[in-house]
């Protein structure tokens, strides 16, 4: 299952047992694990305050492309306008569902699903 679909599923119900079962089902998803790690690790910061929501659909953004750009932000190789431009480039590639429900939430460090 795609990570943003998993997040949407987690958002759909407030039950702790439901959330545990969804996470248990998808425990072996490496992309989900890496995304959760980036998002929930307090020592990982991206150095950006604002991450816009997407209203347009791109072709789709694969995880490796996002991850390599995120590492540039984490390592502070992209700061200021360069960081903003990097994020806008990523946003233009991703579908609005991918961006708003997965990649953007990692960058703002809030999955908004009660995990």
State where each predicted segment sits:
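N-terminal nucleic-acid-engaging modules of covalent nucleotidyltransferase systems
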Residues: 1-115
């Amino acid at each position: 299952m795609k990570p943003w679909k998993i997040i949407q599923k987690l958002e759909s119900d407030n039950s702790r047992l439901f959330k545990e079962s969804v996470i248990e089902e998808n425990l072996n998803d490496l992309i989900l694990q890496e995304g959760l790690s980036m998002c929930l690790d307090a020592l990982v910061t991206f150095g950006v305050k604002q991450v816009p929501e997407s209203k347009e659909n791109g072709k789709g953004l694969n995880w490796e492309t996002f991850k390599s750009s995120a590492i540039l932000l984490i390592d502070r190789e992209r700061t200021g306008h360069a960081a903003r431009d990097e994020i806008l480039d990523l946003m233009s590639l991703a579908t609005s569902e991918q961006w708003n429900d997965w990649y953007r939430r990692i960058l703002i460090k809030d999955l908004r699903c009660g995990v």
